[in-house]
Amino acid sequence: SQAAKVMKTRSEVGDCHFKFNHVLYKHMNVPALEKTDRRVVQTEWCTPKPGVTSDQLKAKHDSWLAASKDKLNSIGWAIIIPKLGQANSAGSFMHFFIFDSLGALMRDQDWQANGGGAAGIQDYYNSYADCSGPSVWSGSIAQRPSQ
């Protein structure tokens, strides 16, 4: 299979380390995710501020999604919580946003800079979590389970 071929030759393109995570899917536009194999992924490691509970973080994430859902440029958002094999993770959890193009990512950046998105993000950084700042990755899905 194509997946076996990718796994067999992975050392030619980089060092791979396999991790086990718990994933909390916050928003997934399944038709958009299935439409293309193209992915632009923005990740950001965060750690709750002292005294902020998991329930408070969940409530903040849920309220942000409810207020922003009609403005989303991403086709997916998940919170990833490291489990096995993550002794040196860069935080307690990671925001994982999926875009279907660089254009969608840039529309999101424009919304943050000019459309009111920055206020919610700054509130999150000030009151809820210390975060590393976003990193962006671009690529394509090599193998889908249905193939």
Question: Where does each model-flagged region fall?
Answer:
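Short S/T/G/P-rich N-terminal loop/turn motif that feeds into the first structured element of a domain
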Residues: S1-Q147
